[in-house]
């Protein structure tokens, strides 16, 4: 997202790095614009217009509970616009706890501490904090039908915590059910979503089992998910949902998606919007002003003054807006067009005479719209 190197570039580290350059007030101004522009009504309309029906929305616990047993409405102020747009365009929202108190893994996206510990599993206070935060969220949205469900914990990962992970989920579900009996609860396995040891049999009547999938070709995926389907969905009569898959070619995306659809497995592509990527629906460019910050953070440039740093941040936030982004049409069609695997389509309308960019080749699967001797990377990670 930031396209720069800062050691363990978690949310907190990035906030500290930005505040160091521009101060607290300008940091807040930047993040306000960043959040406002990252997803807008135009984004949601595009999603709906292209036959997608849900958005998985990553949350940080601090936006709802900045301190233990202290609750905030800041997160709802951000989400309520999404809820309104979701209702307007028939797009469901899945709320996903991407960063939990103490962190649920050692990765930057969980906002773990610099020592890389996942202290959600070692602190009962953090576990109670997570459960109370979910109760706060569930109570606020208990009667909102556009909220499809609550993804309780994104990609937990720590050795030897099968029993603890189940206890955490049970605490969260008990807290949610005290105020909300309507919404689905979604649980991911250990080791970044895929090890569900100790999480059976189901312990809520409205539970969904979720996985994440990035590694493996189409044939490998079919073998793996047939095992999941037979061993989980059919045995326990519960739905499966792939909360993340992505970071690969359009042909790979289409093949995996079609397999999931044939087997009644719900899915969500990751990521929605990224910096200069062809593997997200939207891509935004690095501005010249923001590049100076990247150079500085990467050790390849001088420290910008406050005005220069703030200008770089604001230019980055503006580039996030729908009107400034590039739409990755090929990926959009790979995920939404049912004829993608069998029929090529023009990238866009062209009226001669004029300039026809060579990169605007027809969209469609490999061997349908084009030929590439390596149209997927099964060992992406």
Name each model-derived stretch:
Residues 266-349:
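Extended, alpha-helix-rich binding/interface surfaces that flank or overlap catalytic cores
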Residues 1-36, 204, 210, 215, ...:
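Glycan-binding loop/region signatures in secreted carbohydrate-active enzymes
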Residues 2-13, 224-227, 369-381:
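Short, polar loop/linker segments at the starts of domains and inter-domain junctions
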Residues 62-71, 254-265, 346-347:
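C-terminal/domain-terminus segments
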Residues 1-184, 189-196:
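Active-site mouth of glycoside hydrolases
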């Amino acid at each position: 997202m930031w396209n720069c190197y800062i050691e363990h570039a978690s949310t907190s580290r990035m906030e500290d790095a930005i505040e160091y350059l521009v101060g607290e007030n300008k940091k807040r101004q930047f993040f306000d614009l960043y959040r406002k522009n990252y997803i807008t009504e135009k984004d949601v309309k595009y999603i709906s217009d292209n036959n997608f029906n849900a958005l998985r929305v990553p949350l940080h616990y601090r936006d709802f509970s900045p301190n233990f047993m202290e609750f905030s409405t800041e997160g709802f102020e951000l989400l309520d616009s999404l809820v309104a747009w979701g209702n307007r365009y028939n797009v469901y929202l899945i709320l996903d706890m991407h960063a939990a108190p103490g962190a649920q893994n050692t990765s930057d996206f969980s906002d773990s501490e610099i020592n890389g510990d996942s202290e959600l599993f070692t602190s009962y206070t953090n576990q109670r904090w997570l459960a109370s935060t979910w109760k706060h969220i569930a109570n606020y949205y208990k009667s909102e039908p556009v909220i499809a469900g609550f993804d309780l914990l994104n990609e937990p990962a720590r050795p030897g915590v099968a029993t603890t992970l189940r206890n955490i989920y049970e605490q969260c579900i008990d807290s949610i059910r005290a105020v909300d009996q309507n919404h689905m609860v979604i649980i991911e396995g250990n080791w970044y979503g895929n090890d569900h040891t100790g999480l059976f049999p189901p312990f809520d009547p409205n539970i969904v089992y979720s996985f994440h999938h990035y590694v493996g070709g189409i044939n490998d995926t079919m073998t793996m998910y047939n095992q999941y389907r037979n061993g989980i969905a059919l045995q326990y009569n519960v739905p499966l949902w792939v909360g993340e898959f992505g970071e690969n070619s359009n042909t790979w995306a289409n093949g995996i998606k079609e397999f999931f659809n044939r087997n009644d497995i719900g899915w969500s592509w990751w990521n929605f919007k990224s910096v200069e990527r062809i593997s997200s629906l939207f891509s935004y460019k690095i501005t010249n002003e923001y590049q100076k910050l990247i150079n500085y953070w990467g050790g390849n440039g001088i420290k910008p003054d406050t005005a220069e740093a703030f200008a770089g941040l604001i230019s980055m936030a503006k580039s996030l807006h729908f009107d400034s982004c590039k739409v990755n049409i090929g990926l959009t069609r790979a995920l939404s067009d049912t004829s993608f695997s069998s029929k090529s389509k023009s990238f866009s309308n062209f009226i001669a005479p004029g300039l026809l960019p060579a990169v605007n080749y027809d969209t469609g699967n490999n061997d349908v719209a084009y030929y590439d001797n390596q149209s997927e990377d099964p060992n992406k990670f």
